[in-house]
Amino acid sequence: MSWFGFFDPDFDDFFGRPRKYATEVPPNFNPRKIAQGDNGKGQQVSRYGAGAGHPHRALARRDDFFDDFWKNFSSGKYFVGFDDNVKTTEESDKYVVSYDQENLSPDEVNVDFDKQENELIITVTQETEKDGTKKSSTFHSNLKFEKPVNFDDISAEIGEQGVQVTLPKVHADHEKIVNIPISKAAAKK
């Protein structure tokens, strides 16, 4: 049995999912449970049961996943799970990423793009006050792309439902295929 045979790559791209990091240790934090969920009691539980398959494309991203996990952990960012607020749609000429969280203000959100890693980083910083005590929380959601992005033309908009980021591809998918015309050979004499 493979270490990574617990998911089906057609339905759950484990290593390619957007990850969420916090700058403070969450309650009941257990870094050993990388695939986590919430059982309604504030406790982390595994979302994945046993399964079959050995997805090769996921293995290609496996090393990046663990490298990012430890790189961020060493810099004071704690992996708190996969960010289900981030939704990605791939079109032939662009990626559209939406971060669904209501009532965000532009000063709470920062959108960065790492050109070297081809990675979008959405940072949300929120401050709350309760009983005279102020608390600041920062979450980082990271999303890597397989195809190169034209980073000079990236745009982001914020609305009532959250943030929408448009990332144009360097080459549209249909531009990768070139049609070669076929001519009829001249008849030999």
UniProtKB/Swiss-Prot annotation:
Signal peptide: none annotated. GO terms for cellular component: cell surface. The keyword Oxidoreductase does not apply. InterPro entries: A-crystallin/Hsp20_dom, HSP20-like_chaperone. SUPFAM superfamilies: HSP20-like chaperones. Residues 77-183 form the sHSP domain. It holds the Pfam family HSP20. Residues 26-53 are annotated as: Disordered. Induction: Only expressed in stationary phase. Expression is increased in the absence of adenylyl cyclase and in biofilms. One of its GO terms (biological process) is filamentous growth of a population of unicellular organisms. It comes from the Eukaryota. Keywords: Stress response, Virulence. Belongs to the small heat shock protein (HSP20) family. Heat shock protein required for pathogenicity. Mediates thermotolerance and adaptation to oxidative stress and ethanol-induced stress. Required for invasive growth and filament formation under various filament inducing conditions. Plays a role in the capacity of damaging human-derived endothelial and oral epithelial cells during infection. Potentiates resistance to antifungal drugs, as well as resistance to killing by human neutrophils. Plays a major role in trehalose homeostasis in response to elevated temperatures. This is Small heat shock protein 21. It comes from Candida albicans (strain SC5314 / ATCC MYA-2876). The gene is HSP21.
